[in-house]
């Protein structure tokens, strides 16, 4: 018997086929015990896998004829902690178990059948349950001097008991060193935390292999100890194993192999092996050798020793797979990010109240919270069904005759809820768009399962499969990304407009039935589900993930989401103006993902163009399988025969020295093989750092045009400074900017109340500037920042190489008290090309365009302010998220 994923199911779910099973309380009691245990194990693995993978359905063929669920019960042995996640149903000769996702509010991040981590509790070798295992693992991550395993697992005995254990340990050590024992000798040594007695069974090798992993795991994970095979655990009498039944060489090899195969997980860097010593103690009877006691001394282990791989499962790549030890441990140890160094961020979805695969969601403290965004995008009213978004459904109704009547007819049975329209829910979920889909609409209403309507212009054989896949993907995203913990199924319904087949279910009524508990959708459930939907639609992997060391999601701003929602077939060309820190590059990356799915593109069909290598490398790292990133120079030097769509970022800093880049980009996209492609250009004239012609069309010809005016990057003092510099830039624009280019149509919105630091220091000589930077870097590193938080930027590229060695010399000069501080800074300085690595960036303002760091030093070596100086200053200052130091040398 094995588990397989039913890929031909009519459910929009992950369905695990468990094969044949005997059901019924009495019937299972009467069956062969081994078969009963095996069937139960198969079902539990399927349950565990679905709990950890977003939920789904277990389908089993009922083996015993005449079975009736209502009369006979089930008879499966399911752990109590799992039962509240399950609903059961019989359908003819199949038994269905509906599994909802694991909820981390249970106190552990994922479902586990058995941790296979053991510990000693007085005289017992016990397996740790999931919560005990989690506490143990957290304890093991502490420094060795702070580790007290016993304290982490329960209250300790009084001091007298500790003394008693110490005496036993001494006696056990003496017993371990004895060369011979007497048959039936009664040992003056009871079992304890440090001592375990095990009798040999008939099959010596099997006995050792069965008991030894648990004993070694328990002693290694507690305080070390001794296990004596061949001593009666109740009478403490020496029995041993008869010499005729034991081969010492073979048994030693078996024990060595068994211990070496035990899974271990290291939190330390030394990574030692399990330390143990094996002795065979002779057992004599009336002066003659009768047999042997096998004694094993196990040392306390630095980290974690498992008896075998944890019994925890997941669905991955259409297979039910057991989690490897390393992956299980890492998953168990996942925790919310430490935002103490990110005061501008607020946690909105915590790992402690979500689902196993969800990630923490953080938003800027000045942004609308998750609940407010849900009410903005997806409001819930008690007296009507709300259609949203208004602009989209009105456009669809005006373009497609009969669509309004069709939708209104479908909504008649519902008195309350929200109907969310989309040009393609498939694209919204990261799937490829299907031709012939007019629109999709998701209905969430009280006391009903959510329904996904797909409106086709005509029926074909692929309609059913498409709607099933989209419904399944939506459910998985709501649970695994959105963190929804309730019971959830998405019912797909296909409608064909202007056809005799007005609306038709994609599967028969037999398979539409879900347990009644899945229909229990209260207003509170609706709001929770819609908040998960906000995360699904607006969530993206934050660049903070690299800084925090774990994946974190941010949410798009309102304007970013509005632009992302545009119909790309109708908005082939767009100029997007955005202030520094408004998220232009993030939006550019998301737009390329959408292009891929709307137009069924390969990475070779989508080109991302920017001016500088560092930004190109960042995009290449972030979106390896989405696009082909190049610089403007590379774009102008080469032909791109397969390119159909182009995204241009930081366009205000492009030049025409290598030719008309805008004309070339427009020609490529307008003459693409499959029709006109997408050309979106992101720019900000305020961040122009050169005096050459940019090659952009005049602002009056940049149509259609959109603006992103909400700035969320910078701390309050830096944001205030940027506003001052922007005003100066308007009054003193560089000569190469066309009239009106620094006029924003909408008033900028700046982050307020975010703590940070701004220092402007003038009239220093260059040597004083370099010493200041070196000392400040050391101070920041001592106070919790890392090299990857810091960028030192010069106003000109030529200055970087000119003064680099002098800055390094300043870094080398340390007082005696500093000799044992941070690791060698000389090995932690590099340019902006590898901005994601853990080093201090030393580069020019121009090459750092489009990037950011928590701490930025801007160095002006003391030249007369050139034309466009304020724009260059804006480029510099806007790179800093929390601390900005502007150091000006005297002219």
UniProtKB/Swiss-Prot annotation:
The answer to whether UniProt assigns keyword Glycosyltransferase to this entry is no
Q: Name one GO biological process term.
A: cell differentiation
Keyword ATP-binding in record: yes
One cellular component term (GO) for this entry is:
nucleus
Q: What terms describe the molecular function in GO for this protein?
A: ATP binding
Which InterPro entries does this UniProt record tie to the protein? P-loop_NTPase, Poxin-SLFN/SLFN_N, Schlafen, Schlafen_AlbA_2_dom, Schlafen_AlbA_2_dom_sf, SLFN_GTPase-like
Annotated residues that bind ATP are located at 578-585
Which ranges form a coiled coil?
none
Q: Which Gene3D superfamilies would you find in this protein's record?
A: P-loop containing nucleotide triphosphate hydrolases, Schlafen, AAA domain
Pfam families on file: B3R, SLFN_AlbA_2, SLFN_GTPase-like
Mind listing the UniProt keywords for this protein, alphabetically? ATP-binding, Differentiation, Isopeptide bond, Nucleotide-binding, Ubl conjugation
Q: Please tell me which positions the record assigns to the cross-link Glycyl lysine isopeptide (Lys-Gly) (interchain with G-Cter in SUMO2).
A: 59
Q: Which family does it belong to?
A: Belongs to the Schlafen family. Subgroup III subfamily.
Q: In UniProt terms, what function does this protein have? A: May have a role in hematopoietic cell differentiation.
Protein's name according to its UniProt entry:
Schlafen family member 5
Originating organism = Homo sapiens (Human)
Question: In the UniProt record, what gene is named as encoding this protein?
Answer: SLFN5
């Amino acid at each position: 018997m094995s588990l397989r994923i039913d890929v031909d199911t009519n459910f929009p779910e992950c369905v695990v086929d468990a094969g044949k099973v005997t059901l019924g309380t009495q019937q299972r009691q009467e069956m062969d015990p081994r078969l009963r245990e095996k069937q139960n194990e198969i079902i539990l693995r399927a349950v565990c896998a679905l709990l950890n993978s977003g939920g789904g359905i277990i389908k089993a063929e009922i083996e015993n004829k005449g079975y009736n669920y209502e009369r006979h019960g089930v008879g499966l042995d399911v752990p109590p902690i799992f039962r509240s996640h399950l609903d059961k149903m019989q359908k003819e000769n199949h038994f269905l178990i509906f599994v909802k996702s694991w909820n981390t509010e249970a106190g552990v991040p994922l479902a586990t059948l058995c941790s296979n981590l053991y510990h000693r509790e007085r005289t017992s070798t016990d397996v740790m349950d999931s919560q005990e295992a989690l506490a143990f693992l957290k304890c093991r991550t502490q420094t060795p001097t702070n580790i007290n395993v016993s304290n982490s697992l329960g209250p300790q005995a009084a001091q007298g008991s500790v003394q008693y254990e110490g005496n036993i340990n001494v006696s056990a050590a003496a017993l371990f060193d004895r060369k011979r024992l007497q048959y039936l000798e009664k040992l003056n040594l009871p079992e304890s935390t440090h001592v375990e007695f095990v009798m040999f069974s008939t099959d010596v090798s099997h006995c050792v292999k069965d008991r030894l992993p648990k004993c070694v795991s328990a002693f290694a994970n507690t305080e070390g100890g001794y296990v004596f095979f061949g001593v009666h655990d109740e009478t403490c009498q020496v029995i041993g194993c008869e010499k005729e039944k034991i081969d010492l060489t073979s048994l030693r090899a078996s024990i060595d192999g068994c211990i070496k195969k035990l899974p271990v997980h290291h939190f330390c860097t030394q990574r030692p092996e399990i330390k143990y010593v094996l002795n065979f103690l002779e057992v004599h009877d009336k002066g003659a050798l009768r047999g042997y006691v096998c004694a094993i001394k196990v040392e306390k282990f630095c980290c974690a020793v498992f008896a075998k791989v944890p019994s925890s499962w997941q669905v991955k790549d259409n297979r039910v797979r057991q989690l490897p030890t390393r992956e299980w441990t890492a998953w168990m140890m996942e925790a919310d990010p430490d935002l103490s160094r990110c005061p501008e961020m607020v946690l909105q979805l915590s790992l402690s109240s979500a689902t196993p695969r969800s990630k923490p969601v953080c938003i800027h403290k000045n942004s609308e919270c998750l609940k407010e965004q849900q009410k903005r995008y997806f409001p819930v009213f008690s007296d009507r069904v709300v259609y949203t978004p208004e602009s989209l459904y009105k456009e669809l109704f005006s373009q497609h005759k009969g669509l309004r009547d069709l939708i209104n007819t479908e909504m008649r049975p519902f008195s309350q809820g929200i109907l969310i329209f989309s040009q393609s829910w498939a694209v919204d979920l990261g799937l490829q768009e299907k031709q012939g889909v007019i629109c999709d609409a998701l209905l969430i209403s009280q006391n009903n399962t959510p329904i996904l309507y797909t409106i086709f212009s005509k029926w074909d054989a692929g309609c059913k499969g498409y709607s099933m896949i989209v419904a399944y993907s939506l459910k998985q995203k709501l649970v695994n990304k959105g963190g929804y913990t309730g019971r959830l199924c998405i019912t797909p319904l296909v409608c064909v407009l202007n056809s005799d087949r007005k609306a038709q279910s994609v599967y028969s009524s037999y398979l539409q039935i879900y347990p009644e508990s899945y229909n229990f959708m209260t207003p509170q459930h609706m709001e929770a589900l819609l908040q998960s939907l906000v995360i699904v639609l607006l969530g993206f992997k934050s660049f903070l993930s690299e800084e925090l060391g774990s994946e974190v999601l941010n949410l798009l701003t309102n304007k970013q989401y509005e632009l992302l929602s545009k119909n790309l077939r109708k908005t082939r060309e767009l100029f997007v103006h955005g202030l520094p820190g408004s998220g232009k590059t993030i939006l550019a990356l998301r737009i390329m993902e959408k292009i891929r799915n709307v137009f069924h593109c390969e990475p070779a069909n989508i080109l991302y163009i920017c001016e500088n290598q560092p930004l190109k490398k960042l995009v290449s790292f972030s979106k390896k399988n989405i696009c082909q990133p190049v610089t403007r120079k590379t774009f102008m030097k080469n032909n791109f025969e397969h390119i159909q769509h182009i995204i241009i970022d930081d366009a205000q800093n492009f030049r025409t020295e290598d030719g008309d880049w805008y004309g070339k980009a427009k020609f490529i996209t307008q003459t693409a093989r499959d029709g006109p492609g997408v050309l979106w250009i992101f720019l900000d004239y305020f961040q122009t750092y050169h005096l050459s012609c940019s090659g952009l069309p005049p602002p009056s010809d940049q149509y259609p045009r959109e603006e992103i005016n909400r700035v969320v990057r910078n701390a309050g003092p830096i944001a205030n400074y940027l506003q001052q510099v922007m005003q100066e830039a308007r009054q003193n624009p560089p000569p190469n900017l066309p009239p009106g280019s620094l006029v924003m149509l909408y008033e900028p919105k700046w982050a307020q109340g975010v703590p940070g630091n701004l220092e402007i220091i003038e009239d220093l000589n260059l040597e004083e500037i370099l010493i200041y930077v070196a000392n400040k870097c050391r101070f920041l590193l001592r106070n919790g920042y890392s090299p990857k938080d810091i960028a030192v930027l010069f106003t000109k590229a030529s200055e970087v190489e000119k003064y680099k060695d002098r800055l390094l010399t300043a870094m080398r000069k340390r007082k005696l008290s500093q000799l044992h501080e941070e690791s060698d800074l000389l090995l932690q300085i590099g340019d902006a090309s590898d901005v994601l690595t853990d080093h201090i960036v030393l580069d020019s303002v121009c090459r750092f365009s489009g990037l950011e760091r928590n701490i930025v030093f801007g160095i002006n070596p003391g030249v007369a302010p050139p034309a466009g100086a304020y724009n260059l200053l804006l480029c510099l200052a806007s790179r800093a998220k929390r601390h900005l130091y502007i150091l000006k040398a005297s002219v």
